[in-house]
């Protein structure tokens, strides 16, 4: 996919609310992995991406999830994100909190070795996304 014409998040077809959250979070323009992954993910297509650490892969999959969840009924987990490490799970949660603010997308994280009661409380809040 040629991403040369997609130099900013506005050209990706994102809502104004999400664009504002991106700006607030310090995102100025999509990285190559984001420019390639976001458009097909917004249409519901499965996406597989490979890029080096620090290239914005987490945002590349969180952005379309937040955008799609904004128009779906609330009240139960509507997305499940699996990560291979606790560190990546917490990073993903932080990204969701930053980019899902305007759409009021909530998330909780479940990881081994953490306080089980706190995690149960998080589940009882019926988050939109379970990491």
Model features per residue range: what roles?
Residues 11, 16-27, 35, 74-131:
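Conserved nucleic-acid-binding Ia/Ib motif block in the N-terminal RecA-like helicase ATPase lobe
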């Amino acid at each position: 996919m040629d991403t040369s014409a997609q130099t900013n998040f506005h050209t990706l077809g994102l809502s104004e609310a999400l664009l504002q959250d991106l700006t607030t979070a310090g995102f100025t323009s999509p990285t190559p992995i984001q420019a390639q992954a976001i458009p097909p993910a917004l249409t519901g297509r499965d996406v597989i991406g490979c890029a080096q650490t620090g290239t914005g892969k987490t945002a590349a999959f969180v952005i379309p999830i937040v955008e799609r969840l904004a128009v779906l009924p609330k009240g139960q987990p509507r997305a499940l994100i699996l990560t291979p490490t606790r560190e990546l799970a917490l990073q993903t949660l932080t990204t969701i909190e930053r980019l899902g603010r305007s759409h009021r997308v909530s998330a909780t994280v479940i990881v081994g070795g953490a306080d089980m009661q706190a995690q149960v409380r998080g589940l009882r809040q019926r988050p939109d996304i379970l990491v």
